[in-house]
Amino acid sequence: MADDGALIAVGGSIRVANGCAVSEGHIERVGVSNAWLPRFQTIEYFRAFLAARVAFARLSLLLLISGAFGVFRRDALVAAGGYKHDTVGEDLEVLVRMQRSMCEQGRPYRVAFLPEVCCWTEVPTTIVGLRNQRTRWQQGAIETLLTHRTMLFNPRYGRLGLVAFPLLALEDLAGPVLEFLGYFLIPVGLIFGFLDPKVAILFFLLTCVFGTITSAGSLLLEEWQLRPTATTRDFARLAVASIIENFGYRQMLQLFRLRGIWHFLKGNKSWAAVPRVGLANSTGEDRIHSDRRAKDKTISHRAEVRPLIDGEGPR
């Protein structure tokens, strides 16, 4: 924040602590969970923090800084009204409102993202917990879109109104509905013969390949540039997860997002709990294998683990 006052917020990466060896609140060794659900979320976090947010920050399109790991300029936050109490997506909403306030005042500003700085969180280990979390994220995104709908395609807000906000609407409002309709209409088209099976298969494969390439690229970026995995076995596990997530996990997330839309339409404001197993003094779900890579990289991963409020992550 030591600049000319234009920098109003800075965010960092959040990594998955499930499967890591934790001692007295510190990460001693980085590991990967035995369970598939946390592994899929690990890939998802890599993709969100190392691809999407880095790119959006560089293009001045960043709308979200995770509430658990962000720093805000106090005067800008207070001037915008601080955190709202009537939304379930307060981290997204407050940054949108801060940037909206700066645009309306005609003041230059910046929002930065530092991928090399990270904290660690425990992600949901059950489908019910993941469902509750993603339902609330989706509901919070819709609340923010409607609260600040005057920004949509409004040149007064520059890139924020002309690019960032339309992208948010496309991803969080139209995206789940269109993808669900696709899963429904493709089988119908195949049954009634107005869709070529080859086209349907090719379209599905292209979607999976694109998702896998994005996930694999994020994993390689993390491996080569930031915080490598402790063992080759763990890296292979994540690489496999980046492929398998396209077959079931992704579709399940879309159902949870549709559930979030339904909760919004019903006016549901409840904050559904996400069960936590806890990471205190954990030795990790997997035994961290002693190999040459682990010996060289243990110290660099010693970082404090703090329990994050539910909702921090790759939305």
Q: What would you call each of these model-derived segments?
A:
Residues 1-118:
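Internal catalytic domains of large membrane-associated glycosyltransferases
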Residues 298-315:
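Long, low-complexity, intrinsically disordered segments
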Residues 167-265:
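Membrane-embedded multi-pass helical conduit in multi-pass membrane proteins
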Residues 113, 118-132:
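Catalytic cores of eukaryotic secretory-pathway lumenal/extracellular enzymes that build
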Residues 43-50, 128-151, 185, 215-219, ...:
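Catalytic core of nucleotide-sugar-dependent glycosyltransferases
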Residues 287-288, 293, 297-298, 302:
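N-terminal helix initiation/capping motif
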Residues 129, 133-147, 238-282:
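Membrane-proximal soluble regions of multi-pass membrane proteins
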Residues 155-171:
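Membrane-water interface at loop-to-transmembrane-helix junctions
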